[in-house]
Amino acid sequence: MIALAGQTPDVIAILPAAGIGSRMQTALPKQYLTIGNKTLLEHAIDALLCHPCISEAVVAISAEDRWFYQLPVAADPRVRVVTGGSVRADSVMAALRCASAASWVLVHDAARPCLHQDDLRRLLVITAHTEVGGLLATPVRDTMKRAHTGSDIIAATVEREDLWHALTPQLFARDLLITCLERALAEGATVTDEASALEYCGYAPLLVPGRVDNIKVTRPEDLALARFFFSQLANTESV
């Protein structure tokens, strides 16, 4: 549903946070590592709920999660919690089933704490001219290599001109996202992000240029970089 000119879209946010982040090599799941006095997950939630169009955040956590309910954000009436699944798409579907009614759904990584409000505003603007949705992304700048399958030997250099790094948030019409995720999961498709489910069903989401400092904390070295970027963000925005 396209938002009419001058009309604010109704949006709910989903944060899949059921993963354990094994590549971080930490005792805590990565979303519970901290920047300042808040976890990565709290920073991600805060950045979304700052925007007046986003009325609710649904967090999908593991059934074994023993950390979320200790966080102050767990008491926020705008935050709902659902038990997630073993893969991202299952967690997103679980959140969609319990979320309040809304025309649009925004999905954001729980370990991506450095979202700028300018990026979020640019993404939400697309609801005025698309019935599908889109995602924040950055053009690939480095030279890209493809390896032989199962090998660390270069097979080819990949043309980077039309390649983009997919980021989050990703924003889609709610009913369309549900339909595409259900079909992709039922047919055994590989769904690495929400956009890939829509692509599988023949839709073409929009790429919305975003900032390169909107990083996802995946490896140990990412946390120090995220802390630096967040310190810069705190100097320019009210966080």
From Swiss-Prot:
Entry annotated with the keyword Heme: no
One family name in Pfam for this protein: IspD
Pathway: Isoprenoid biosynthesis; isopentenyl diphosphate biosynthesis via DXP pathway; isopentenyl diphosphate from 1-deoxy-D-xylulose 5-phosphate: step 2/6
Gene3D superfamilies: Spore Coat Polysaccharide Biosynthesis Protein SpsA, Chain A
Catalysed reaction equations from the record: 2-C-methyl-D-erythritol 4-phosphate + CTP + H(+) = 4-CDP-2-C-methyl-D-erythritol + diphosphate
A Gene Ontology biological process term: isopentenyl diphosphate biosynthetic process, methylerythritol 4-phosphate pathway
Presence of the UniProt keyword Nucleotidyltransferase in the record: yes
Catalytic EC class: transferase
Entry's Gene Ontology molecular function annotations: 2-C-methyl-D-erythritol 4-phosphate cytidylyltransferase activity
Signal peptide per UniProt: none
Residues at the site labelled Positions MEP for the nucleophilic attack: R160, K216
Enzyme Commission identifier(s): 2.7.7.60
Keywords on record: Isoprene biosynthesis, Nucleotidyltransferase, Transferase
Subunit note: Homodimer.
Task of the protein: Catalyzes the formation of 4-diphosphocytidyl-2-C-methyl-D-erythritol from CTP and 2-C-methyl-D-erythritol 4-phosphate (MEP).
UniProt xrefs under NCBIfam families: ispD (TIGR00453)
Protein name as it appears in the record: 2-C-methyl-D-erythritol 4-phosphate cytidylyltransferase
Protein's organism: Sodalis glossinidius (strain morsitans)
